[in-house]
């Protein structure tokens, strides 16, 4: 007698094994041409132009100081390596990164960067340059972890804003993103870098703004951040003296205002069309930080007002592209991340130029993509790569609140990438 169990009726269910998809797909030559959106292409082109222009200006601005040290191409070579590595990484992120992983990677990137920054600021591993203990020496290279704290803050705030939009309607819901921002600012402030603290506050403000936080809350957050940063500026003698000199009209031309004065003289010497690339006078030890925070003055001197206008025009165009990416998407992660990238890159660029022309006190922030500094360039290119990827392949994140956004893809029955 056959005792086998009866076979079920209907079509049998076949379960196929599901392979885990890697974070980054294999890079091939066709994949490098996969960036097809107009916004991502425009953003990549602007970034590569600014990076290439920055290499030329770093070579010019650093040639005198590097030449006295024995190698006129040393700063240029270091910047060139960072540019090649960073541009390759940017293209890899833009074309092959699975953006669904970005919210998952965000806490890892953020807390790792903050941890390394704390080690830099509080232990002998850190190296002090110009009064800021913000660098770790790795052989012949110096790494600035605070630049990667900016990248981590962009990602972790975007992840929070995308998952819990409804919670931002209450005061308790504001505490986590404020805590993330305060943690980043506090870790960097321990290294005495007020300029980076200002940019981190700007990034946080950009995230709240693009996440539709109410205007009174934005005003409260902005006012609180301003008060805190002013208090921070009083904790260092040189910062206090620079702020006081600027607020009093900067009359100490040979002392506290020397750097600002030399920058303005460089711009005046450049006039409308400049003295020609390589022909700057100010870089001959008149202007401190000529290849870094004050490279804008060398650009104005060598390429004139027209060259500086083209540079600022590129950043305005970048702002337009990032704003398009942020406002044309229904994905909350992309919206918040693009808004914070705009606040970081474009806001920092105009803050740098404001210092150069004397309308803001000297607080030390580099010109994105242009100033010498490998860590800054790598972080800038990494965030642009993320924005290019998100412009083409937005992340869709399910919210955990009871508030349903009818414009959200999940509300219309679309697939949700992360649950």
Give the location of each predicted region.
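Helix-boundary and loop/linker segments of multi-pass membrane transporters
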Residues: 33-37, 169-174, 284-287, 329-330
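A juxtamembrane structural motif centered on a specific transmembrane helix
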Residues: 1-25, 29-30, 350-419
């Amino acid at each position: 007698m056959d005792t086998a169990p009866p076979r079920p009726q209907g079509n049998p269910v076949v379960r196929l094994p599901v392979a885990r998809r890697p974070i980054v797909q294999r890079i091939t030559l066709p994949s490098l041409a996969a960036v097809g959106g107009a916004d991502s292409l425009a953003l990549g082109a602007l970034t590569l132009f600014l990076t290439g222009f920055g290499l030329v200006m770093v070579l010019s601005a650093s040639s005198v100081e590097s030449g006295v040290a024995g190698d006129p191409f040393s700063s240029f070579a270091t910047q060139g390596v960072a540019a090649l590595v960073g541009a390759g990484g940017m293209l890899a992120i833009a074309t092959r990164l699975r953006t669904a992983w970005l919210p998952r990677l965000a806490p890892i990137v953020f807390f790792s960067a903050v941890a390394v920054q704390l080690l830099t600021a509080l232990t002998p591993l850190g190296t002090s340059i110009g009064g800021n203990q913000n660098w770790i020496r790795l052989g012949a290279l110096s790494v600035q972890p605070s630049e990667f704290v900016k990248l981590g803050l962009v990602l972790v705030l975007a992840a929070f804003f995308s998952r819990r939009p409804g919670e931002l309607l209450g005061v308790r819901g504001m505490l986590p993103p404020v805590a993330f921002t305060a943690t980043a600012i506090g870790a960097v402030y321990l290294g005495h870098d007020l300029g980076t603290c200002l940019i981190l506050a700007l990034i946080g403000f950009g995230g709240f703004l693009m996440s539709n936080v109410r205007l009174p809350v934005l005003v409260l957050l902005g006012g609180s951040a301003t008060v805190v940063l002013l208090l921070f500026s009083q904790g260092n003698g040189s910062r206090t003296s620079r702020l006081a000199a600027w607020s009093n009209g900067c009359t100490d031309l040979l002392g506290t205002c020397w750097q600002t004065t030399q920058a303005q003289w460089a711009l005046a010497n450049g006039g409308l069309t400049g003295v020609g690339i390589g022909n700057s006078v100010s870089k001959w030890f008149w202007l401190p930080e000529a290849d870094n925070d004050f490279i804008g003055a060398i650009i104005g001197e060598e390429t004139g007002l027209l060259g500086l206008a083209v540079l600022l025009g590129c950043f305005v165009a970048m702002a337009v592209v990032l704003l398009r990416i942020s406002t044309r998407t229904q994905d909350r992660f992309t919206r918040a991340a693009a808004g914070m990238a705009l606040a970081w890159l474009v806001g920092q660029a105009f803050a740098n130029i404001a210092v150069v022309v004397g309308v803001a006190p000297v607080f030390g922030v580099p010109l994105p993509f242009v100033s010498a500094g490998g860590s800054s360039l790598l972080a800038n290119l990494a965030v642009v790569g993320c924005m290019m990827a998100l412009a083409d392949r937005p992340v869709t994140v399910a919210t955990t609140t009871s508030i349903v956004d009818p414009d959200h893809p999940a509300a219309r029955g679309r697939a949700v990438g992360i649950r």
